[in-house]
């Protein structure tokens, strides 16, 4: 019975690992699909984590709950990026999908054959506009911070101050608000 339980745990751990890899690569990657697709993938991953959580696995349950509660905040960057890509498409008078394809090219490693094959395809499709669009998309990616990293950075810096508030009172909170503004 212990071997069966161990085998079940190994399968569950492998499944959760795969789901988290999908989450990182397909949902949270800056150069990725449109917001609607990311939301659909996000919901699928949450659903799959829910099936694997159970009462015996509080770590998976906590992870699923945290991800479920933070969906809109974690994906906020994708909406910003979508708008930037739409602006680039309008500026260069191209279909949005062509600009999205260049965005997805940024996911590939520049020394890989797949990168250069796709680069050549896109270059031949867009010809004179390719380099301008490539540069604009690169800038859009650089200037689109993922909300989660900003929130985590801010939380880590402010967490200690908010715990101090419990012992120091509301006057300390007023001082902290003044300092942060």
What is each PLM-predicted segment?
Residues 1-181:
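Acidic/histidine-rich catalytic cores and adjacent linkers
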């Amino acid at each position: 019975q212990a071997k069966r339980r161990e085998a079940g745990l190994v399968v569950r751990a492998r499944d959760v690992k795969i789901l988290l890899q999908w989450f990182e690569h397909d949902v949270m990657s800056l150069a990725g699909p449109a917001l609607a697709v990311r939301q659909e993938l996000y919901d699928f991953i949450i659903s799959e984590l829910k099936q694997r959580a159970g009462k015996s696995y509080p770590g998976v349950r906590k992870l699923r709950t945290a991800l479920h509660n933070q969906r809109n905040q974690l994906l906020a960057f994708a909406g910003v990026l979508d708008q930037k890509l739409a602006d680039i498409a309008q500026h260069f008078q191209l279909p949005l999908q062509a600009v999205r394809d260049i965005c997805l090219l940024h996911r590939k490693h520049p020394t890989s054959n797949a990168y250069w094959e796709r680069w050549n395809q896109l270059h031949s499709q867009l010809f004179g506009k390719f380099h301008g669009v490539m540069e604009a998309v690169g800038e859009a990616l650089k200037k689109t911070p993922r909300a989660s990293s900003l929130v985590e950075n801010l939380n880590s810096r402010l967490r200690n101050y908010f715990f101090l508030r419990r012992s120091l009172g509301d006057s300390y909170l007023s001082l902290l608000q003044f300092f942060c503004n």
